[in-house]
């Protein structure tokens, strides 16, 4: 493989400089860490990355294995959602893209063209995420997704997230106060799982979402 040979040769030059004590810097450790990682030497890659974090006083970005994990998640989960015909799937895809560490590296011209071809609502959500616009309705949907994402068992459950977007839009249409998203997400999760083989108890959800039994019951009634 020509890429492997080129990376191996580059690694030999970098290591030679490192051993001779030349140009010992954050850039050198960074190059060593990335080259070690892609040559299959993760332990040495971690060692070099640790040196960066020890000497740097500023944010040094993400380690190569973190970026590689983001690439895997992007290709297997995010991209299919962004290309889906259903706009709720696309919104969830935009949300997941925003969660990825080192996402800037993934933003090729092809990905930008996909995002630029989306509808106005999806572009508005992108702008909300990037620029921090005050958009109460999209903010409510987003905060709900963020709460779901914080739970490991939910974070890649596509049907749960797209159902939440649909449910959130119905809640918004009722013109209720949208500040307290936790009560709505807790009630939504309870109703989503109540007929499953592993339903959540109200006590579990009260603890997980810091919601009182009264609020949870009232919100379940409201959604029903």
Write out the residue ranges for each language-model feature.
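Structural detector for internal amphipathic alpha-helices that build alpha-solenoid repeat scaffolds
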Residues: 8, 30-35, 60-69, 91-101, ...
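TPR-repeat structural position
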Residues: 7-11, 42, 90
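Intrinsic, low-complexity N-terminal interaction/targeting segments
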Residues: 145-185
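Extended intrinsically disordered, low-complexity coil regions enriched in Ser, Thr, Gly, Ala
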Residues: 102-123, 177-224
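Boundary/linker segments of alpha-helical solenoid repeat arrays
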Residues: 19-28, 54-65, 90-91, 104-107, ...
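Single conserved hydrophobic/aromatic residue that forms the stacking wall/gate
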Residues: 1-16
């Amino acid at each position: 493989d020509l890429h492997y040979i080129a990376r191996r040769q580059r690694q030999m030059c970098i290591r030679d400089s490192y051993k001779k004590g030349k140009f010992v810097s954050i850039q050198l450790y960074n190059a060593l860490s990335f080259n070690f990682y892609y040559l299959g030497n993760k332990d040495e890659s971690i060692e070099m990355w640790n040196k960066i974090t020890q000497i740097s006083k500023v944010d040094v970005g993400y380690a190569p294995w973190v970026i590689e994990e983001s690439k895997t998640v992007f290709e297997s989960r995010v991209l299919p959602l962004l290309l889906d015909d259903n706009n709720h799937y696309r919104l969830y895809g935009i949300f997941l893209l925003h969660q990825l560490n080192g996402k800037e590296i993934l933003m090729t011209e092809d990905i930008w063209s996909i995002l630029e071809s989306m509808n106005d609502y999806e572009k508005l959500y992108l702008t909300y995420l990037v620029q921090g616009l005050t958009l109460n309705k999209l903010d409510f949907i987003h905060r709900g997704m963020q709460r779901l994402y914080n739970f490991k068992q939910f974070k890649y459950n596509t049907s749960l997230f797209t159902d939440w977007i649909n449910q959130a839009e119905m809640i918004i249409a009722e013109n209720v106060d949208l500040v307290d998203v936790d009560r709505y997400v807790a009630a939504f999760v309870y109703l989503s799982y109540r007929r499953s083989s592993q339903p959540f108890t109200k006590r579990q959800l009260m603890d997980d979402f810091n919601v009182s039994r009264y609020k949870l019951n009232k919100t379940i009634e409201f959604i029903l």
